[in-house]
């Protein structure tokens, strides 16, 4: 059946509303879940910062990740929350933020529908439009999208795909109707996509390649290359402009891959296996296959994907059908960087080398594959019945698994525990440290001691468990226990300044000030030794962990707590001389000056501290008011 243009528009509005209604029908309850986040830097540096400090907080956060669009959407959430509550409609910010995530995801599902229509050049055919819509529902309910939808701080993936799909659609329009305005939109949308997530760089190659494949059998090779060259150059230039701007804000981060070829090969195959299983068989809990480092299974799955790629290539050359080959290249392009991440040994800047959310955009390929299946197996009744039955089975299974995974995001405690408890790197933290905290809350010291001893047996060298034992024995006033674990910590961390600094701060927290001083003195001695060794070989010290200004700052706190205010002031000033942007050192120096009765000088230091770090504004303003009374 052929639709008119107006009927086609009505159809598109209807399917968007149907998709939105379907998703809310199954997942409306998640709007009432608490805030979950896996990004402490975001929470501390942006979400909690006062209004006039948002800009500087996003700048500080950009030292790690450059996500300006992401921050703007969170500010939009805050603004909408304010408008609703100002109008008398009481609503939590978490509900607004979660609704924004759902809105973005459903919109991406609709863009997948439009994208498939564009690559197939299907305009107003009702039957094909329905099949494309059914295929887009696979994207909508695919289980690996769970974290993107239900976790507020992983919105950048959906934003990146949103702008990426719009870029793709405009490029397809431009391929058949070249206009200057299209080039402007392409550059802007691709720039916004990169600002949301750098991993969408793959579109710079995938978009021209897709257009090339679509035209391969229609025009000659030279003309085909010319048709794509302008878009390819535009996307590359946009990327280089973005990357230059990003390099201005972010700090340099060195990553190191595994040295051994065997290790590289092993992690290439196992990382590929992780993402291929997540894409094609997402019906197990993620960590069932995340912790499975079976190389044989990984090679088998990779081989199956190669066979599928060969089949798609056969259809392209012999049947002139580019659809499956486009899906192959989409999977390869979108998963290249995530697989490379899996081969990083040290210095990876994100939370985990392997994460399902990194492959959010690759789910588009699954919708393309399902459209091909529904389209090519609907010519005969029995094939149509088989295809639709298979589709319904997969769709309902996806909804069921996605519903089950949504329960992880009830609150942040559940989220952090459930998502990491089976991770081989984090099992010691979550199997016993979480029950320990619960036992303390419930005043159940038997359960606390049981989990503490189990925690220690898992990893006797882990600093967290040694400090936990110290905390316990200090509470129990058990001198023998304290001595044993102090010696144990000394044995494990005597040559590691960052470990010694942890112990010093632990002592400060427990008001063991002289012990804390002694530990910091040990670090200074080690630094003097390191400095002499490097200077003897003509090298220069550029970075220390912990930084020297932090050592003086900690000494200042200790002297302040001991009421040795003159010495504390000297330490805080030294920290500020070493690091002029150490606003907290200035702030504490101001408090010390107030203790010494120098109110005028204290007021000036408060103002200097606020100028460097507006986060201190509210507290400092109160103290200034008190000082001037």
Question: Where are the predicted features?
Answer:
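C-terminal luminal/periplasmic domains and tails of membrane-associated envelope-modifying transferases
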Residues: 2-3, 417-629
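Polytopic membrane enzymes that build or remodel cell-surface glycoconjugates and lipids
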Residues: 2-445, 453-464, 470-472
